[in-house]
Regions:
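Compositionally biased low-complexity segments at domain edges in trafficked proteins
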Residues: 227-261, 428-430
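Active/binding-pocket-proximal capping segment
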Residues: 330-333, 338-362, 395-399, 409-416
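Extracellular/periplasmic metallocenter environments
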Residues: 139-154, 158-162, 166-227, 361-430
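N-terminal, post-signal-peptide metal-ligating segments of extracellular/periplasmic oxidoreductases
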Residues: 2-6, 11-155, 159-165, 169-174, ...
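Beta-propeller domains
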Residues: 319-326, 332-336
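Active-site-proximal structural scaffolding
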Residues: 24-26, 32, 190, 206, ...
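Structured loops at beta-to-helix junctions and adjacent beta-edge loops in soluble globular domains
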Residues: 62-67, 137, 186, 198, ...
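Generic recognition of flexible, low-complexity loop/linker segments
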Residues: 121-122, 238-240, 311-314, 323-326, ...
Length: 430
């Protein structure tokens, strides 16, 4: 854990390792509503953003705004905070968030996303050595036109960053309403990272401006160690021995939601963050049982009340396959995740392979993984029997929805089928 770690909502948190060294130059964008650059088309992909560009040059365009989402049906009222009386039909909670607008080619299309934020933010995935440009547009807040909050993009854990691109507004730039800023990155270290807005970060992170980013290792596609012929050549890290090889991957952004703070932001009130008392505990922006609902698309109304919470946390695999679980915590509480009846092997912490100075693997076999605020873990599981297994927070206090009866909160399901039940995975969380 780095010196920026936090256990209370009083500021930013660090991932605690040397990760990506930023270089090159980025450029300020034009006025958003005056002109709009053309970006590459994006195939429909509800989980991980497919960046535009061929080869090692990748471009992504994100927009920051506000919107409405839904907590699990049947959650008891906590008036006046939940459900929010200003929420449109089908929704109950006010949020801030990011949207992927990479495929949009006109200013009008991008502007139409205002007031339609999603949580958690789009997952981003890049390869080692990619030249990455992420353009952030600030669309403003539809519900709060009185606010002129800027937004930034902070790649959590990328140390030694050029301040201009680090996203900490005190040391760099914030994107004002109606403007763009392009961030430039060249990732050199594989691992599981996260990103968030660092402008008024205690508020903006709690309100939903959090997402995950993966850097895939250069070792991918290469047979190393004792990896058998025919096995999928995907790895979590450049391990050199194949010990982090996996068949499927699923990512989880761990957060909490304090209904009172979300209500106050919608109703022009101020929160005292020392009173922090979450009402809901979420995986990828959803509480159980919504966590096991299918992936959605924020552009489609078919998702109903989960339209703007499009990322599923359901884990599926065939018996005997190895599954990579990417865990990131941008909440303000510690979370200890337990997987019933399936051993877990922790191979990395904070985007750093667990390896000793002598080169030996220091992986940890366990049934519970602790993830502190601002931290990440990479975990491998290989189920040996068919069935359904629960992955959940070990603190039962975090397994409810707004204090209501029954199970809820930070819980999902690992569903293991016979060989051949699930075809090859093409995207994370599918």
């Amino acid at each position: 854990m780095s010196d920026e770690s936090r256990s209370t909502p009083t500021g930013g948190a660090g991932l605690g390792r040397r990760a990506v060294v930023l270089g090159g130059a980025g450029a300020l964008g034009s006025v958003l509503l005056a002109s709009r650059a053309t970006f590459g088309q994006q195939a429909k992909r509800p989980t991980v953003v497919r960046a535009a560009g061929a080869g090692p040059v990748k471009s992504v365009h994100l927009a920051g705004t506000d919107g409405w989402v839904s907590m699990p049906a049947g959650s008891p009222p906590d008036l006046p905070f939940y459900p929010d009386s200003l929420a449109p039909p089908g929704f109950d909670t006010y949020v801030f968030g990011f949207r992927d607008v990479t495929s949009m080619t006109t200013a009008q299309e991008v502007a139409a996303v205002r007031g339609k934020a999603q949580i958690s933010a789009p997952m981003l995935a890049f390869d080692e050595g990619d030249e990455v440009t992420i353009t952030l547009s600030n669309l403003g807040l539809l519900m709060r036109p009185d606010l002129f909050d800027g937004h930034t993009l902070h790649w959590h854990g990328f140390v030694n960053a050029i301040p201009l691109f680090d996203g900490v507004p005190e040391l760099s730039l914030a994107v004002p309403i109606g403007r763009d800023l392009s961030y430039y990155y060249r990732p050199h270290d594989a691992g599981t990272y996260m990103y968030h807005c660092h402008f008024e970060d205690v508020e903006h992170v709690q309100m939903g401006m959090t997402g995950m980013v993966f850097v895939r290792p250069a070792q991918n596609g290469t047979r190393v160690g004792s990896v058998p012929t025919g096995a999928r050549l995907t790895y979590a890290y450049n391990d050199g021995d194949g010990s982090t090889r996996y068949d499927r991957e699923f990512a989880f952004m761990l957060t909490e939601l304090w209904s009172a703070a979300h209500y106050r932001d919608a109703h022009i009130q101020v929160s005292d963050w020392t009173d922090y008392a979450p009402s809901f505990w979420l995986l990828n922006g959803r509480g159980y049982p919504d966590t096991v609902a299918p992936n959605g698309d924020p552009r489609s109304t078919a998702g109903g009340r989960l339209q703007y919470q499009p990322i599923s946390s359901l884990i599926t695999c065939n018996v005997g396959e190895t599954v990579l679980l990417r865990l990131s915590n941008l909440g303000y509480q510690n979370h200890a995740l337990t997987l019933d009846n399936v051993d877990m092997q922790v191979v990395a912490k904070d985007a750093s392979l667990l390896r000793g100075r002598d080169g030996s693997n220091n992986y940890l076999s366990t049934n519970t993984v602790d993830v502190g605020p601002g931290e990440s873990r990479d975990v491998l599981v290989t189920p040996r029997v068919e069935g359904e297994f629960l992955l959940y927070d070990r603190s039962y206090a975090y397994l409810g929805n707004g204090g209501g009866p029954g199970w809820g909160g930070m819980m999902t399901v690992l569903r293991v089928g016979p060989a051949g039940t699930y075809g090859p995975q093409t995207e994370p969380n599918t």
